[in-house]
């Protein structure tokens, strides 16, 4: 069967549905069609084709709830070019744009005031130099608990963050590793929930039950560290009010603890929190606080689905639909979102703007609206050395994460002599608590064996150990039973050993960011610390490159006769 030339304008065979329209014609035999061909609409044929829609309606951008974003982009482009130019194809066909009834609804009037009005940012810079927690307005019961734990003066980042979070602002907390970021968000949260909160008139009538704060961490070690911090502040009688939901632990016991203890704070890893939430065992719709610790790691692709569920369910009123016309802005306003990390690359800034409501960036002695931060665009061409490229931003983030009171050195050694150099380094610096980093798990045991053979107490820590074994190793290391902890990249984040006075890189870190994370294990809370990198002669150029990127003096040295000898070296650019 063929279509004649005279019939092509009036009799066009169309396969139409609510999703697409396929047009066949102009002397095309059916037998030659193995699959339908999609061709452009002819001007004369367009007027004769009627769109067939099913009951569910057409698949449009409006039905996907992304129409507003497209319109915004079009308006932005029109502003740059001086006006919206009609499409040449649309003008040729005399097409009129179809207005969706979905878009005709007054969205702004439906939004609650809390989602529309911006919060007033009040900054009392005198609090940046606060000498006590009383000056920050914490409740008396909480201050008493802090005094019993020996915590009397806030750090710089705590002085800046506590008042901002107490004013109900969404915040991004950025400070170097070991500066006290965990307490910077825990203290204002515990001022609002739990037995240590400040008394209010609603206490007698408030029957809120369930989880009120969810803290997400990328690793089990960091999650358990946060749990211990909360338990320490709550005290032995109320530590049941915090529950860990980390991967690797027994899930059924975690679910039983949720049912029995009814915790107000949940701390866990994305996968386990999402898993228990999907099973209906964790209810977070009435949650008031969502904290994402080490958020730059939580933005990784492997956390995407779990983080999507957490962001959709935590602090969202039960009974609302995912396609509610109020949109994500209203849902964000139902909770207070706090993002925390030692590094704040451009990806974190974009995430904060998307997940939070008028967030502010909190640094030591500094609080600024996040909207004032310029987000660099990806560079397609070769970037200039002085350009504001994303790679330069990442390097700057690594610089910001380094504790300020560190000394950096590097020495050269043959691969087979690295362990002996490690031992001589520890003796020369008289270090008592040492963390040695390697890139792989397999050689850890060999390094521990060689150190033990020379009379130096050492142990290993890696991901293949079970949860109980890891906890035991960390406890013994913190208690001083082991002098050296040999580990891999697993512990570069979240490992909190305040007494650590020396970090040694037995293997070179992969980049300057990983160097900064490793170095952050020492020099915590203002203490002094030392970082030594042991490399081969052929690897010294990598150290010089990281020195340039981090803008810190990594000095060449050697260890002879039980002493540290520092060499002078001109910078090699």
Curated annotation (Swiss-Prot):
Motif placement: Q motif: 131-159
Originating species: Oryza sativa subsp. japonica (Rice)
Stated family: Belongs to the DEAD box helicase family.
Family annotation (PANTHER family): DEAD-BOX ATP-DEPENDENT RNA HELICASE 47, MITOCHONDRIAL
Amino-acid positions noted as binding ATP in the UniProt annotation, renumbered to this chain: 175-182
Record PROSITE patterns: HELICASE_ATP_BIND_1, HELICASE_CTER, Q_MOTIF
Domain Helicase C-terminal as annotated: residue spans: 421-565
Catalysed reaction, written as an equation: ATP + H2O = ADP + phosphate + H(+)
Span(s) of short sequence motif DEAD box: 293-296
Domain Helicase ATP-binding: from-to ranges: 162-362
Domain notes: The Q motif is unique to and characteristic of the DEAD box family of RNA helicases and controls ATP binding and hydrolysis.
Protein's name in the database: DEAD-box ATP-dependent RNA helicase 47A
Coiled-coil region(s): none
GO molecular function, one term: ATP hydrolysis activity
Keywords recorded for this protein, A-Z: ATP-binding, Helicase, Hydrolase, Nucleotide-binding, RNA-binding
Domain of life where this protein originates: Eukaryota
EC number assigned by the record: 3.6.4.13
Family matches, as InterPro entries: DEAD/DEAH_box_helicase_dom (IPR011545), DEAD_box_RNA_helicases (IPR050547), Helicase_ATP-bd (IPR014001), Helicase_C-like (IPR001650), P-loop_NTPase (IPR027417), RNA_helicase_DEAD_Q_motif (IPR014014)
């Amino acid at each position: 069967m063929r279509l004649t030339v005279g019939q092509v304008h009036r009799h066009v065979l169309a396969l139409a549905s609510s999703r697409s329209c396929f047009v066949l014609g102009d002397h095309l035999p059916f037998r030659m069609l193995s699959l339908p061909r999609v061709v452009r609409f002819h001007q004369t044929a367009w007027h004769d084709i009627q769109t067939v829609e099913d009951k569910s309606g057409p698949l449009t951008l409006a039905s996907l709830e992304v129409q507003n974003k497209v319109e915004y982009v079009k308006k932005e482009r029109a502003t740059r070019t001086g006006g919206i130019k009609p499409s040449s194809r649309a003008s040729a066909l005399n097409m009129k744009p179809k207005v969706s009834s979905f878009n005709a609804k007054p969205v702004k009037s439906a939004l609650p005031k809390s989602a529309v009005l911006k919060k007033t940012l009040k900054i009392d810079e005198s609090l940046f130099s606060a000498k006590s927690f009383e000056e920050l307005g914490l409740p008396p019961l909480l201050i008493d608990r802090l005094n019993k734990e020996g915590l009397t003066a806030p750090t710089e980042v705590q002085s800046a963050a506590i008042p901002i979070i107490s004013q109900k602002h969404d915040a991004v907390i950025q400070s170097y590793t070991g500066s006290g970021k965990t307490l910077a968000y825990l203290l204002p949260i515990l001022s609002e929930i739990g037995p240590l909160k400040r008394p209010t008139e609603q206490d007698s009538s408030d029957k809120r039950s369930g989880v009120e704060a969810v803290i997400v961490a990328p690793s089990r070690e960091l999650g358990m560290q946060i749990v211990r911090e909360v338990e320490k502040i709550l005290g032995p009688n109320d530590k049941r009010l915090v529950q860990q939901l980390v991967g690797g632990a027994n899930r059924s016991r975690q679910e039983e603890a949720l049912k029995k203890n009814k915790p107000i704070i949940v701390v866990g890893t994305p996968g386990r929190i999402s898993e228990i939430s999907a099973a209906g065992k964790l209810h977070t719709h009435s949650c008031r606080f969502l904290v994402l610790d080490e958020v730059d790691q939580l933005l990784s692709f492997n956390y995407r689905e779990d983080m999507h569920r957490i962001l959709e369910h935590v602090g969202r009123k039960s009974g609302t639909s995912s396609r509610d016309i109020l949109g994500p802005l209203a849902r964000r306003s139902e909770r207070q979102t706090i993002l925390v990390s030692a590094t704040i690359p451009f990806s974190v800034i974009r995430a904060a703007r998307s997940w939070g409501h008028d967030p502010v960036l909190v640094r030591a002695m500094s609080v600024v609206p996040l909207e004032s931060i310029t987000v660099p665009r990806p560079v397609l061409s070769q970037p200039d050395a002085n350009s504001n490229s994303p790679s330069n931003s990442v390097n700057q983030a690594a610089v910001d994460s380094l504790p300020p009171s560190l000394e950096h050195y590097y020495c050269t050694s043959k691969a087979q002599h690295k362990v002996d150099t490690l031992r001589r380094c520890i003796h020369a610096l008289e270090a008592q608590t040492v963390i040695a980093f390697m890139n792989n798990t397999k050689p850890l045991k060999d390094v521990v064996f060689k150190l033990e053979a020379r009379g130096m107490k050492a142990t290993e820590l890696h991901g293949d150990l079970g949860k109980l074994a890891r906890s035991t190793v960390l406890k013994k290391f913190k208690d001083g039973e082991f002098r050296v902890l040999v580990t891999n990249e697993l512990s570069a984040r979240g490992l909190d050993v305040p007494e650590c006075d020396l970090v040694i890189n037995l293997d070179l870190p992969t980049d300057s960011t990983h160097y900064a994370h490793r170095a952050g294990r020492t020099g915590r809370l203002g203490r002094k610390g030392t970082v030594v990198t042991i490399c081969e002669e052929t690897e010294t150029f990598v150290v010089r490159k990281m020195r340039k990127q981090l803008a810190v003096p990594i000095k060449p040295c050697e260890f002879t006769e039980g002493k540290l000898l520092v060499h002078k070296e001109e910078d090699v650019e």
